[in-house]
Amino acid sequence: MATTPAPRLLLIDNYDSFTYNLVQAFLVLGAEVLVRRNDEIDVAGALALAPTHLCISPGPGTPRDAGVSMRMIEAFAGRVPVFGVCLGQQALVEVCGGRVVRNSRLMHGKTSLVEHDGRGGYAGLWSPLEVGRYHSLVAE
């Protein structure tokens, strides 16, 4: 019986201490994780790695300060699933034509209930699910 190969995830590290928390989570899920800093790889080098998934990490500054992050999203969008966390999510918003602006209501250390259908990333989780929020920006 043939087995499905492990996802080959390229994680662009935007110099953030949270990056290796993401690496650990993806490893637990069975992915092969390739980490490259945002100034140590170009799009051609990333394509040569043949990832099946792309993740853009958190980091300081704005998406325009994040090295190759936005170029990676442009190159891989539509080819492989692309996931962004914090700064990575902001980069996704900007590449897709949106804007990231300050929220009129800060959500630092606040909790909220999320109701979901139990599919995808929510599989096996309670609904409603109490989640922690820590953000001061929103996408328009």
Where are these predicted regions, by residue range?
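Cysteine-nucleophile active-site neighborhood
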Residues: 51-124, 128-130
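Single, functionally critical "micro-switch" positions that shape active/binding sites
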Residues: 12, 85, 134
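A short acidic, often aromatic-flanked loop/helix-cap motif at beta-alpha or helix-coil junctions
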Residues: 40-44, 108-109, 139
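Alpha-helical elements of the RecA-like P-loop NTPase motor core of helicases
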Residues: 20-21, 44, 90, 94, ...
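Hydrophobic alpha-helical segments, especially transmembrane helices
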Residues: 17, 90, 134-136
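Short loop/edge segments at beta-strand edges and connector loops
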Residues: 37, 102, 133
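N-terminal beta1-alpha1 cap of cysteine-dependent amidohydrolase-like domains
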Residues: 1-78
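Active-site oxyanion/phosphate-handling segment shared across diverse enzymes
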Residues: 126-140
